[in-house]
Swiss-Prot record:
Subunit structure: Homotetramer.
Source organism: Zymomonas mobilis subsp. mobilis (strain ATCC 31821 / ZM4 / CP4)
Enzyme class of the recorded protein, top EC level: ligase
Pfam family, one: Arginosuc_syn_C
Taxonomic lineage from the root: Bacteria, Pseudomonadati, Pseudomonadota, Alphaproteobacteria, Sphingomonadales
Binding residue positions for L-citrulline: Y91, S96, N127, R131, S182, S191, E267, Y279
GO cellular component term, pick one: cytoplasm
Catalytic activity: L-citrulline + L-aspartate + ATP = 2-(N(omega)-L-arginino)succinate + AMP + diphosphate + H(+)
Family membership noted in the UniProt record: Belongs to the argininosuccinate synthase family. Type 1 subfamily.
CDD domains from the UniProt entry: ASS
UniProt-listed InterPro entries: Arginosuc_syn_C, Arginosuc_syn_N, Arginosuc_synth, Arginosuc_synth_CS, Arginosuc_synth_type_1_subfam, AS_cat/multimer_dom_body, Rossmann-like_a/b/a_fold
Annotated protein name in UniProt: Argininosuccinate synthase
């Protein structure tokens, strides 16, 4: 028997899945539905989502549409960039990092309207169900969570489309007149999954890409830019101070123009299976390269190496949905502490899909040209000191070698 629910807050995009879920919640639970649509910079008009919700019987006062772009970049993307976070060495976590913010705002709305449940449109095969629900429970331990994909019998795209058509819910088509790929988009990235991409041997067709030009078609002339950093966060491009969301938007424009940030990836989902996705992260790809460039100049070597050791664990926590966990917060505190003097300017070259650091400077630089020079260093470094350093580090290896020579 279905548990009684009076009012539910649905994370609503206005797309096919969440529109079907909205109708299903009304029919299956007989409850009042409140919709929440987050503007995370996905680049789509949000008003169609409002109109669609109204057409499906949602009261205007129960339709929430929030511009979260600045909060998204400032409080979620930038902290992650301070860590140089990459899941499995490649993925910039564009979908993963958006879910904690959506969950946070959903819970806030649920409290505001007196809802006793929240709902999402993530499937029972993916990571997003975990990310959303770990966020819900961390912020509202007693909230009821409705995950329709784990409850209903609409277990395929064809059944979902049939349900939609039977209830006059518009079924979107892509530019080829076909049902679209599974797409997630925000200010940091766009991901595409499903259909032909489910065969990992098939090359991603060019028509799938939406955020970047083909690198082969990018300008034949490189573009040189500078990014200014303060305490680990980017604050300006080419000397122009920008807000976090404005800065990432500008980097996205530059990355799009030069075909930067495409990634074809087979990844290990937390749920246990492998999946293949196509990611476009133009601005984020530029930003992480620039951040590493300024760290190379300003971060102590031991601190940098420790940070690099911690990064995979930090990235895994975000990927798996543990943004609100104490261990993520502990790692974040250490990472943020490391950024106290990570300030300065990085110069980069953008060209046909590549981004390369070609210069960096900082008032906090640990780089000493006087010490490292191949020319006369005027006594800044005594090369004879290296002999004792090497002997001490070789001691255990010499003892091991002596034992091996005895055949022991």
């Amino acid at each position: 028997m279905t548990e009684k629910v009076k009012r539910v807050v649905l994370a609503y995009s206005g797309g096919l899945d969440t529109s079907v879920i909205l109708k299903w919640l009304q029919e299956h639970y007989g409850c009042e539905v409140v919709t929440f649509t987050a503007d995370l910079g996905q680049g789509e008009e949000l008003e169609p989502a409002r109109k669609k919700a109204e057409m499906m019987g949602i009261k205007p006062e129960h339709i929430f549409m929030d511009d979260l772009r600045e909060e998204f970049v400032r409080d979620f993307v930038f902290p992650m960039m301070r860590a140089n976070a990459l899941y499995e060495g490649q993925y910039l976590l564009g979908t993963s990092i958006a879910r904690p913010l959506i969950a946070k705002r959903q819970i806030e709305i649920a409290r505001q309207v007196g809802a006793d449940a929240v709902a999402h449109g993530a499937t029972g095969k993916g990571n997003d169900q975990i990310r959303f629900e770990l966020g819900y429970y961390a912020l509202a331990p007693d909230i009821k969570v409705i995950a329709p994909w784990r409850e209903w019998d609409l277990n395929s795209r064809s059944k979902l489309i049939a349900y939609a058509e039977s209830r006059q819910i518009a079924v979107p088509k892509d530019k080829r007149g076909e049902s679209p790929f599974s797409v997630d988009s925000n200010l940091l990235h766009t991901s595409s999954e499903g259909k032909i991409l489910e065969d990992p041997w098939q090359e991603v067709p060019d028509y799938v890409y939406s955020r970047t030009v083909n690198p082969e078609d990018a300008p034949n002339t490189p573009e040189i830019i500078t990014i200014d950093f303060e305490r680990g966060d980017a604050i300006a491009i080419n000397g122009e101070a920008l807000s976090p969301a404005e800065l990432l938007t500008k980097l996205n424009e530059l990355g799009r123009k030069h075909g930067i940030g495409r990634l074809d990836l087979v990844e290990n989902r937390y749920i246990g299976m492998k999946s293949r996705g196509m990611y476009e992260t133009p601005g984020g790809t530029i930003l992480i390269q620039a951040h590493r460039g300024i760290e190379q100049l300003t971060l102590d070597g031991g601190a940098m190496h420790l940070k690099d050791e911690l990064m995979p664990r930090y990235a895994e926590l975000i990927y798996n949905g543990f943004w609100y966990s104490p261990e993520r917060e502990m790692l974040q505190a250490a990472i943020d502490h490391s950024q106290a003097r990570v300030s300065g300017t990085v110069r980069l070259k953008l060209y046909k899909g590549s981004v390369n650091v070609i210069g960096r400077k900082s008032p906090n630089s640990l780089y000493s040209e006087k010490v490292v020079t191949f020319e006369d260093d005027a006594g800044a470094y005594n090369q004879q000191d290296a002999a004792g350093f090497i002997k001490l580090n070789a001691l255990r290896l010499r003892l091991l070698g002596e034992r091996n020579a005895k055949g022991l």
